[in-house]
């Protein structure tokens, strides 16, 4: 689950701020916290959280969303330090525009959203859930056993063109 929206910081309602941070940060915190005892017992514990390219960039009218994704990155980096001694790695994915439930309303509203992000992408398209799944599969694999505290950008080259 994830939420975007909230509007400009100046006019954002506190309830909108709280709701976005609750879904995007507090839920991630609670899930990570609940998993820690199990991960410590695992021979190869892995945490992979979902951030956003907004962890590096920012967008007007996206103050709560951008803040929430910075918090996910900070939490994940902290978990990498706290759990490393147990062999647990903690990383996060930084997706660009991916065709998901979050982007569905924008895609359904007309061609502008897809055209905007496709033009920004070096690959000329939006990402698919399988693109994120592949990145997650890599981070949970033994090939990534020495990667921790890292944000893996999966954005089709958007940040390279920015």
Residue ranges and their predicted role:
Residues 52:
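Residue(s) in the substrate-gating loop at a strand-loop-helix junction
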Residues 121-132:
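A conserved structural motif in NAD(P)-dependent oxidoreductases
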Residues 32, 68, 76:
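Active-site helix of classical SDR
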Residues 12, 58-66, 78:
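Active-site loop-to-helix junction immediately N-terminal to the catalytic Tyr of the SDR YXXXK motif
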Residues 57, 137, 148-162:
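Short C-terminal tail/terminal secondary-structure segment
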Residues 84, 89, 147-149:
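Short, small/polar-rich loop/turn modules that mediate ligand/substrate recognition or access, typified
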Residues 8-9, 16-18, 113, 117:
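Substrate-binding pocket helix/loop in short-chain dehydrogenase/reductase
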């Amino acid at each position: 689950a994830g939420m975007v929206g909230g509007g400009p910081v100046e006019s954002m309602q506190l309830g909108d701020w709280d709701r976005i941070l609750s879904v995007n940060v507090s839920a991630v915190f609670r899930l990570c916290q609940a998993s820690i005892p199990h991960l410590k017992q695992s021979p190869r514990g892995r945490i992979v959280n979902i951030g956003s390219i907004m962890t590096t960039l920012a967008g007007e009218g996206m103050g709560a969303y951008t803040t929430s994704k910075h918090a996910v990155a900070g939490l994940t980096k902290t978990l990498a330090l706290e759990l490393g001694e147990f062999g647990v790695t903690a990383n996060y994915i930084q997706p660009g525009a991916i065709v998901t439930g979050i982007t569905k309303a924008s895609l359904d509203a007309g061609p502008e959203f897809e055209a905007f992000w496709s033009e920004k992408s070096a690959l000329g398209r939006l990402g698919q859930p399988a693109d994120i799944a592949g990145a997650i599969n890599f981070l949970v694999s033994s090939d990534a056993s020495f990667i921790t505290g890292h944000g893996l950008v999966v954005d089709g080259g958007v940040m390279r063109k920015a």
